[in-house]
Amino acid sequence: MSRDTIAEVLTVIRNANMDGKKTVKIPSSNITENIIKLLLREGFLENVRKHYENGNYFLVLTLRHQKTKKGTFTNILNLKKISRPGRRIYSTSKKIPRILGGIGIVILSTSHGILTDREARLEGIGGEILCYIW
């Protein structure tokens, strides 16, 4: 049985978010590093460090929290995995969905690497829809 590393990463971030944790540690791979770099660039994460422990590399993520009068909340409200190993979802550049009218982002795996929906539309390429974040 194969592991869906993207789903595992999204679940770890979602659970840490709901639990109110500031940092979370996930296993490192090329695709997870690219997705995490994209989340950092889009402002959903505060910091990322690569950590070596017991012969394996891990990414230590610092989640971005904001303080309000009612308490703290995070920037990532929802993470939803779309394409999965049993059912891959592909889209052309013209049919990439807009999440909340452009407020959320769609992460795609393209021939040019891991891109957001805006970057893929600008380059005019489609690909596999990995997840929605809003």
Swiss-Prot record:
<dbReference type="InterPro" id="IPR035987">
    <property type="entry name" value="Ribosomal_uS8_sf"/>
</dbReference>
<comment type="similarity">
    <text>Belongs to the universal ribosomal protein uS8 family.</text>
</comment>
<dbReference type="InterPro" id="IPR047863">
    <property type="entry name" value="Ribosomal_uS8_CS"/>
</dbReference>
<comment type="subunit">
    <text>Part of the 30S ribosomal subunit.</text>
</comment>
<protein>
    <recommendedName>
        <fullName>Small ribosomal subunit protein uS8c</fullName>
    </recommendedName>
</protein>
<dbReference type="GO" id="GO:0009536">
    <property type="term" value="C:plastid"/>
</dbReference>
<comment type="function">
    <text>One of the primary rRNA binding proteins, it binds directly to 16S rRNA central domain where it helps coordinate assembly of the platform of the 30S subunit.</text>
</comment>
<dbReference type="GO" id="GO:0019843">
    <property type="term" value="F:rRNA binding"/>
</dbReference>
<dbReference type="GO" id="GO:0005840">
    <property type="term" value="C:ribosome"/>
</dbReference>
<dbReference type="GO" id="GO:0003735">
    <property type="term" value="F:structural constituent of ribosome"/>
</dbReference>
<keyword id="KW-0694">RNA-binding</keyword>
<keyword id="KW-0934">Plastid</keyword>
<dbReference type="InterPro" id="IPR000630">
    <property type="entry name" value="Ribosomal_uS8"/>
</dbReference>
<dbReference type="GO" id="GO:0006412">
    <property type="term" value="P:translation"/>
</dbReference>
<dbReference type="Pfam" id="PF00410">
    <property type="entry name" value="Ribosomal_S8"/>
</dbReference>
<dbReference type="GO" id="GO:1990904">
    <property type="term" value="C:ribonucleoprotein complex"/>
</dbReference>
<keyword id="KW-0699">rRNA-binding</keyword>
<keyword id="KW-0689">Ribosomal protein</keyword>
<keyword id="KW-0687">Ribonucleoprotein</keyword>
